[in-house]
Amino acid sequence: MLEPPKFIENDCYNGSRTFTWLADMVGLSVDLVNFLICQISALFLASLFRSMLHPSKVSSKLRHTFALSIGLAFGYFCFGQQAIHIAGLPAICYIVIRTQDPRIVQRAVLLVAMSYLLCVHLMRQLYDYGSYALDITGPLMIITQKVTSLAFSIHDGFVRGDEELTKAQQYHAIRKMPSALEYFSYVWHFQSILAGPLVFYKDYIEFVEGYNLLSTPPGNGNLDSSKREVVLEPSPTKAVIRKVVGSLVCAFIFMKFVKIYPVKDMKEDDFMNNTSMVYKYWYAMMATTCIRFKYYHAWLLADAICNNSGLGFTGYDKDGNSKWDLISNINVLSFEFSTNMRDAINNWNCGTNRWLRTLVYERVPQQYGTLLTFALSAVWHGFYPGYYLTFATGAVVVTAARTGRRLFRHRFQSTQVTRMFYDILTCLITRVVLGYATFPFVLLEFMGSIKLYLRFYLCLHIISLVTIFILPKFIRGERRLRTSNGNGNVRLSGSGNTKDAVTTSVESTAALTAGNDLNEDKEEDKHAQCKVHTPTQQQPAAGPHKTTVEQPTEQPNNVNLRSRPQQQQPHLEKKAMPPTCARDAVSVPHDQCEMDQLSSKLKEKIEAETKNIEEFIDKTVTETVSGIVEFKNDLMRDIEFPKLKLPGSNGAISLDSSNGGGLRKRNISSVHDNGTDPGHATADLHPPLEENGAAFLKKEIEVINAVVQQAVPAVLSNGHAK
């Protein structure tokens, strides 16, 4: 019998056992207690990181050092000696990044990282088979995502041109090699070392250096060019509270119902032989749903930690509320109430979806995208047979769902009632399909999963294959033709009634993640939406209601169909516009119009806030200057009044008479002729007092003039000069 190596002891947790007493008290295993202690500590440390270690107060080096130090401490506390792998994998990959040619660095890093991860997966499977204890493979899976995505971003930035990149690839491209401190801080930062989510390198560096709140983020990887306007930093408090409360609710639901629907009972002979088909489907659906709430709890808490440190801001919604979903891993309600597999996949493990899209789906021929994406996802999870059964089944049902949607959906869009019926029906079907496809993922075993599938009579497998290969021969679905502008589709129903069936829509064909090729038109160019402006969009329309339809031509994958460019716009063909918003690059682009609207709303919100600040400064400066000028005028009026009674005099002295000429003239005159004019005998009685008063007022006026001349330009130039 194989004996486990020193750093892997069978049925033995290697992390700290300091809080064993607390684990016994609350009824949880010590590994889960350690995990919760670290995450709760990270939540409070994140607040300190955002406030006391704000980029305006400390250097980026200090922020990097603090983040990676706390991350390493958490890793050692939770995993003990196994934490050596947290250091080993990224260290080897960093050597590869620094030594290999950028033309092949992405492949080399992917090979090294996946090989290291698979070795650890294999050792865990050999020496701790079927264990659900917290182990080192979880953090290693996140680290693998980080180092491989960084390598591909370096390849995109150093080797490929902008015209070859998708919108997301342009945004994440890195053209400056990371230093050792930046690299290891990115890999080990405490916010995501235990449970994710995946943060792309560029987003993390901009967050640490304080550029993540700039109104005009750079479109390339040169993070050191930073003369840009800073917007007001929004508070993440509401988002953090909402996600922490949601995490607690999900933890309660998991603890409450996981004992009612234990997954292990599905392997028992009594369940397989003595229960009805309907109950089997119901139990599979409920058991997998309960397990999902464990992931909801971990992901929501991890997202709250990132938000509390200031990471994750993406702009404002239509009501002006700040949005903190840049790196969110889950949308619970959107997933649980999704009406098709595409929406379900897009809202589950979003960080991994973005990673798979970046590494695989956008870089391989379109016809192989789904298969290769599911294959990498399965290998990344490990060697348990249940993973491969789930992803193989998922690939089949995803393809069937896309075909079925094309065949049937348009038939239910005539009235509001039929649309509602279709949505409810597809929501229920999606729930059943998810339970059917994902129970092998939690069972892990091959034979147990196969036996249960046979008890299901492979119903959904058969229905999926029939939907893919047989139904299209008998049922005519929607036919799609590309419009002349390259951005829209014309849907043609198979019924032949073009008046009622023809509808125009703008749909994204960018690569969807983790097998998300549910875009119903395979012939659409998935990079077409990456062009912000194209010459075809500038051509005059033939009429206000006229749509020109072109027959689709066969083209290789990733080839754009372009019209002849106009002479006045040759530059638009040469270079694609960089993305202007982080959200454009990280979101799964179902709908490009929605992405453009979000970017526009963010820009409008920032402009509105900036305008309010400018108006406030204008008002403040105007009132200040007006007050100073009025004070000056008042003093001048006092000086130029015709009479001024001086102390000790018997009467008023004329200060603006024809023979006096005012206080200034009298002062000057008294200096030059020493008061010999008989017409000024009264004034000559007190020449020292008069000279002192004039000198004092003259000095005050000169000081005020100097203040006005210096203060007004200084105030106006303090970020407010037009």
UniProtKB/Swiss-Prot annotation:
Further information: 'Oysgedart' is a Yiddish word meaning skinny, chosen because of this protein's role in phospholipid synthesis.
E.C. numbers: 2.3.1.-, 2.3.1.23, 2.3.1.n6, 2.3.1.n7
GO molecular function: acyltransferase activity; lysophospholipid acyltransferase activity
Name assigned to this protein: Lysophospholipid acyltransferase 6
InterPro entries, per the entry: LPLAT_7/PORCN-like, MBOAT_fam
Major place of residence: endoplasmic reticulum
Record membrane topology: Multi-pass membrane protein
Family assignment from sequence similarity: Belongs to the membrane-bound acyltransferase family.
One GO term describing the cellular component: membrane
Pfam families to which the protein is assigned, alphabetical: MBOAT
Location relative to the cell: Endoplasmic reticulum; Membrane
Protein keywords: Acyltransferase, Endoplasmic reticulum, Membrane, Transferase, Transmembrane, Transmembrane helix
Transmembrane segments: 25-45, 62-84, 104-123, 180-200, 243-263, 378-398, 424-444, 452-472
Species of origin: Drosophila melanogaster (Fruit fly)
Reported function: Acyltransferase with broad-specificity, that mediates the acylation of lysophospholipids to produce phospholipids (glycerophospholipids).
Record bears the keyword Acyltransferase: yes
